[in-house]
Amino acid sequence: MSKDTISNMITSIRNGNLSKAKIVQIPATQTARSIAKILLDEGFIENFREVVISDKNYSLLTLTLKYQGRTREPYITTLRRISKPGLRSYSSYQDIPKVMGGMGIVILSTSQGIITDRQARQRRIGGEVLCYIW
C-alpha cells in the first residue's frame, strides 16, 4: 500500500467501479473524509460511513458506489490524479481548468480546506489541484 492516501483512494474507487462492487473500503484520513463528502454532495457516490475497528485502533471509510440503469454503469466515468507527491500542480482561481466543459469537477486543496472548482471560483481562491472527476 502506498503512502499517498489520495492516489490509494482514487485507485480503490476506480477498481471498485470496474468490478461493479457495491462498496469500497479505504483507510480513514481527514483528506479521504473531505473527498468522500465532496463525492457524496456532487452525486458520484450513494453514501459513506466510518467504521472504527476498536481492537486495532484503526478506522476505515466505507464508500457505497452509485450505478445507473440495469447495466449498472458507474456514475464515475473517470478519476484522474493530477498533483502527485513528486510533481505538485497549483492553480489560481482564474486558471482552474473546467473538466468536460463543466460537466465534471476538479477537487482542490486550499487554505480553506478541500473544495470543488466551483466553490474555489466563488470564494476566489486557488490551491493544489488534487484530481479530476467526471
Curated annotation (Swiss-Prot):
Q: What is its main location?
A: plastid
Q: Where in the cell is it found?
A: Plastid, Chloroplast
UniProt keywords (A-Z) are: Chloroplast, Plastid, Ribonucleoprotein, Ribosomal protein, RNA-binding, rRNA-binding
The answer on whether this UniProt entry bears the keyword Acetylation reads: no
InterPro entries, alphabetized:
Ribosomal_uS8, Ribosomal_uS8_CS, Ribosomal_uS8_sf
Taken from the record, one Pfam family name reads Ribosomal_S8
Q: One Gene Ontology cellular component annotation? A: ribosome
Source domain of life is Eukaryota
The family classification in the record reads:
Belongs to the universal ribosomal protein uS8 family.
Q: What is its biological role?
A: One of the primary rRNA binding proteins, it binds directly to 16S rRNA central domain where it helps coordinate assembly of the platform of the 30S subunit.
Q: Assembly and partners?
A: Part of the 30S ribosomal subunit.
HAMAP family per the record? Ribosomal_uS8_B
State the protein's name.
Small ribosomal subunit protein uS8c
Annotated source species: Chara vulgaris (Common stonewort)
- Which gene is transcribed and translated to give this protein? rps8
